[in-house]
Amino acid sequence: MKVYEILYKVYLLEDISLKEVQREIFRIIDITLGKSEDTLRLHNKNDFKNYCFNSFYPIEKDGVYKEGNIYTITILTIYKSLMTYFNKNLPFAYTTRIRGLKTQLKVLPKKKIRKIYSITPVIIKNDQGYWRGIMEKEEYMKRIKENLIKKYNGFFKTEINEEFEIFKSFEFKNNKPISNNYKGKSLLGDKISIEIEDNVQAQDIIYMSLGTGVGEMNARGLGFMGYRWE
């Protein structure tokens, strides 16, 4: 398994506010996926999409991304075929607000990872709403681990022994829930920082997580993680 990085340069056709950014990015990605039967099936299937993306870079301090400026979006995936498809098609994609320009590819080297941390908020869904007040931190951590193992098992079509540790330490970086707009609703998430155990299984799964995202709704720009090597 490899994690593929696509640096996607785009040109803004009009101003986009911070709260609109993720929606506008996944819109241009969705349009691109819809142009092929194979990638449309990936988009529509009720399963892990195994790609994730961050926000526009450079960051605008006033929270407004400007018409006429060029920004970079980082997209990560563990699917080589999807990387190839994005590289071929994203430069020609456009919406009423964003026009694609070019892509640049690389493979993230597989080195020992010391920690990962949220660039975009992590979402864990449950029927009662936001998790705080409903579950303890240990249950939240368990849900994160289970989600990662499901992604790993799904990609490799296996069932690994789950009796191993992934998290050496687990810290929340936000004091209150972070609101994320999706289809007119507010989804509450968290910024987390995790130190990673040294064992091979933990390192393999966390390397994978850079390409899949952590938690849920990764194809909507959530759970995108930064990392620090040893």
Q: Would you name each region that the model predicts?
A:
Residues 1-230:
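RNA-interacting cores
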